[in-house]
């Protein structure tokens, strides 16, 4: 670290990492001594998570993590996967929706579903949330949500660039309050992560595809 002061993002990352190690250990070990140590690590992680601003109190968070412990391979804790779709049309416009939960605008996105490929999830999310049919063209980005600070849940975000192929605008009644096509000079507000993804998105819409964005390894890769 470059400062003696620990940031909330660092505390959150360390907490989630410790919790993942401890829950994975509990999922694989039946040795009582080891299990007790893993549970103690979970207590430390819950203290850190609460200090980072979690809504639950220490005991509730620890209990929630304990209830999520699986056995064997299903118990190996990994980041969740979110799949998004930046969709462009022939008029150079970008498909955006206003999220029902926050009122913010963003491209269609959702959790990866079992039984679907990542590209299929992108097509499915676009259809369900906006009524538009699309075809995936390329992967724009694969990034760590915690590292970029746009989530408090450990996740990898995979964002596809897609071209609209049909359908008509229709907002999902539970997930979106509005949907629409927008040019770069007429974007709605508030828009999530404007500077982070919008320039790359419109470059793709206009045909200037770039290499997939990803988080370069830190040096050292871990831990601080």
Each language-model region and where it sits:
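Alpha-helix C-capping/helix-to-loop hinge sites
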Residues: 24-28, 72, 143-146
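Juxtamembrane/interface motifs at transmembrane-helix termini
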Residues: 55-60, 116, 209-210
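Nudix hydrolase/Nudix homology domain
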Residues: 2-38, 44, 104, 174-224
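Unchanged
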Residues: 112-136, 143-201, 221-224
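Acidic, metal-coordinating catalytic segment for phosphate/diphosphate chemistry
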Residues: 35, 39-84
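N-terminal strand-loop-strand
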Residues: 65-107, 134, 138
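Short glycine-rich loop/turn motifs that provide flexible caps or phosphate-binding loops at active sites
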Residues: 30, 81-83, 108-109, 114
